[in-house]
Amino acid sequence: WGWLLLITSLTHVTHITQWLALVRLADQLRYASWYAFLLFLLHAHRSFKDNRNFVGLIVLAVSLTAWGLVALGLDVLGMGAWDQLSRGILFNAMAMPILAMVLLEQVFRNATKDSLWNIKPLCFGLAGTYVFDLYLFSQAVLFNRLDEEALSVRGIVHAAMMPLLLP
């Protein structure tokens, strides 16, 4: 993802801009999938079955994903002021790893003692990717642009964390 985003940010070809939109769409769907998986793990625990906080986490995950998809759609269609739209996209990109880390923390906190050692590699792997994404997108929000060097190693960081996710 990082190399494709770097190539699309350095070139101004319109069909590559469409690839950039597809990459951002894939990133949104990846986060939505991890949200669904982590919420499924949380729902399996007794402490979250009849809890209003769990419903709040679901609403937050759905709204963040929808916000990102709407902003992406507006960007692709060319609607809205670019400055406001790009800020919205960057804030959404920064908020998504934050929510993912909150969900991951809740999964780890509510794990039983028997399953704690089984869930630690998952938590380390996902936390590594989310911390790097938070670094990348918080810097982008501060400076209103993505750092090309950090973006180019994003794929390497995500690939380095994958062995922790595999059984």
Identify the residue ranges that each predicted region occupies.
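Secondary-structure edge/capping motif, primarily at the C-terminal ends of alpha-helices
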Residues: 10-14, 105-111, 141-142
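Hydrophobic, small-residue-rich membrane helices and short re-entrant helix-turn-helix hairpins
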Residues: 108-120
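Individual alpha-helical transmembrane segments in multi-pass integral membrane proteins
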Residues: 1-101, 122-134, 149-166
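Phosphate-binding active sites in nucleotide-utilizing proteins
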Residues: 136-141, 145
